[in-house]
Design a protein with these regions (language model features):
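Short beta-strand elements
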Residues: 134-149, 258-279
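Conserved aromatic anchor
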Residues: 47-51, 157-192
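Ligand-binding face of N-terminal immunoglobulin V-set domains in extracellular IgSF glycoproteins
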Residues: 95-126
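Recognizes extended acidic, P/S/T-rich segments that occur
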Residues: 64-106, 178-241
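Beta-strand-rich modules
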Residues: 235-268
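Extracellular Ig-like/FN3 beta-sandwich strand-entry sites
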Residues: 119-123, 227, 241-247
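Surface-exposed beta-loop interaction hotspot
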Residues: 111-116, 120, 129-165, 169
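Gram-negative bacterial Sec-dependent N-terminal signal peptides
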Residues: 1-22
């Protein structure tokens, strides 16, 4: 789920945001955020964070129990250049036993329950130090309020549409999520978690190294939008040949920036021949 390197063409109207976009200043830091991101289609889950400070030599994050979960120190030329914005994401293991996955991936499954047991909700402390030992501090909240996965993704050649879901796709179905709420593992069922915004992405599925691979359309729209659809500019679609394989992603972004994405394979500029089925 490398959506943080997307390039949004200048011709595309809207804002290309990322799931790790902090929503407010963070004390001494310009931004800081810790969040959970789920891909409901692939069925994987990860921890992401972002911090943005000024002229730092080192940066660190402690969880609500005071356990250090991340530390970074500048060395050599980076010590001269300094640290400012730091973003990272954990490995994203499968959260279900996917029968089509590699054997190694199936051995490393981390269920939703396992993941929530590993991480502690609450206040995460971000700290950084500069040349003279001056200290920057900021706090952000990690919650287990996980928005439900979008469903019914469609692309008609120019418009991407979707609907509101009620579970986490391959990571957990509705009934299992209800059990986790009743057991006190989850504070709220995902179907009841408010969506602050929807992140919508269209990207081609081309060979590695193909320049077209960086031409990705990304936009965010308000979570309370009544009409859940986005029109993709024709100027963007004109960059691709007929029958170019691609995919669309729609992410439900919660108030604490936790995000759940769903993706679907599509055919860009499809004609009567359609895209070849690689399967």
């Amino acid at each position: 789920m490398k959506r943080y390197t997307r390039i949004l063409l200048a011709l595309v109207l809207g804002t290309g945001a990322t799931a790790a976009m902090a929503t407010e200043p963070c004390d001494d830091f310009g931004e800081c955020k810790a969040l959970i991101e789920i891909n409901s289609t692939d069925g994987d889950i990860g921890f992401h964070f972002l911090m943005d400070g000024d002229d730092l030599n080192s940066a660190r994050i402690d969880d609500p129990d005071g356990v250090k979960v991340f530390e970074d120190k500048a060395k050599g030329p980076l010590m001269e250049q300094k640290l400012t914005e730091t973003f990272a994401e954990s490995a994203e293991p499968l959260c279900w036993d996917d029968p089509d996955a590699d054997e190694e991936d199936r051995e490393d499954v981390v269920t939703l329950e396992d993941f929530l047991e590993l991480w502690t909700p609450g206040t995460y402390l971000f700290t950084g130090k500069g040349d003279e030992g001056e200290k920057s501090e900021g706090e952000t909240e990690l919650t287990f309020n996980l928005p439900a996965a979008p469903i019914d993704l469609e692309f008609d050649g120019s418009v991407i549409s979707w609907d509101v879901g009620d579970d986490l796709g391959n990571c957990a179905d509705y009934d299992r999520l209800m059990d986790l709420v009743n057991e006190g593992v989850l504070p709220t069922h995902p179907e009841a978690v408010d969506v602050d915004s929807w992140e919508v992405v269209l990207e081609p599925d081309v060979e590695d190294g193909d320049p077209l691979g960086s031409l990705k359309f990304t936009i965010r729209v308000a979570g309370d939008t009544g009409l859940k659809e986005v029109t993709v500019p024709m100027e963007y679609l004109a960059y691709f040949d007929d029958n170019t394989p691609g995919k669309i992603e729609v992410g439900a972004i919660g108030g604490e920036d936790n995000a759940t994405f769903t993706e679907v394979e599509i055919c860009i500029n499809e004609d009567v021949e359609g895209c070849e089925d690689e399967d």
